[in-house]
């Protein structure tokens, strides 16, 4: 019984420690944090939300399920190379970017989405909806379908 109680306590503290590790990281003059896979991570991101002016959310189109391991590239409106590149370990990303217009590309399962957003004093929320499977007909190009099938 003591072993089970100790294991449960250690698991609870491990989850809390993981949530506390989420903090804003710096890259190319932008600060960002991604996560939200569990309750603790979502709470940690909620505490960081006031620091962000871009909020990204990655979901499945049909069911609205959360996605993780999404490749994200943020481009300033006048740039051809990304000012920020990250892999979102969870369904949410918070970004503190200099004021301006941005193009944000997200790639998941071979499907790529590109949306525009303006970073101002008020946060802009950008939702990327991906098909359950890239070949299920939700805006997946023939190239995306072939790539997802491994051809």
What feature does the model see in each segment?
Residues 83-89, 117-119:
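Short beta-strand segments within Ig-like beta-sandwich modules, predominantly Fibronectin type-III
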Residues 1-4:
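Positively charged n-region of N-terminal signal peptides that target proteins for export
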Residues 6-7, 17:
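Cleavable N-terminal signal peptides
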Residues 20-70, 109-151:
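Primarily secretory-pathway and cell-envelope proteins
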Residues 100-106:
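A short tyrosine-centered beta-strand micro-motif
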Residues 71-83:
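Short amphipathic beta-strand segments in non-cytosolic proteins
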Residues 12-18:
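N-terminal signal peptide c-region/cleavage motif recognized by signal peptidases
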Residues 90-96:
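Short, surface-exposed beta-strand/beta-hairpin micro-motifs centered on an aromatic residue
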């Amino acid at each position: 019984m003591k072993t089970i109680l100790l294991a449960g306590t250690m698991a609870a503290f491990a989850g809390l420690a993981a949530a506390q590790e989420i903090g804003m990281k710096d890259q190319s003059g932008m600060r960002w944090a991604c996560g939200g896979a569990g309750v603790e991570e979502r709470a940690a991101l909620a505490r960081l939300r006031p620091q962000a002016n871009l909020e990204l959310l990655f979901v499945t189109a049909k069911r609205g399920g959360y996605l993780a391991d999404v490749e994200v590239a943020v481009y300033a409106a006048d740039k051809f190379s990304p000012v920020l590149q990250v892999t979102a370990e969870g369904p949410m990303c918070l970004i503190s970017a200099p004021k301006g217009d941005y193009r944000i590309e997200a790639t998941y399962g071979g499907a790529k989405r590109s949306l525009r957003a303006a970073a101002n004093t008020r946060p802009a929320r950008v939702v990327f909806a991906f098909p359950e499977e890239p070949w299920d007909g939700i805006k997946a190009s023939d190239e995306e379908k072939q790539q997802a099938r491994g051809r």
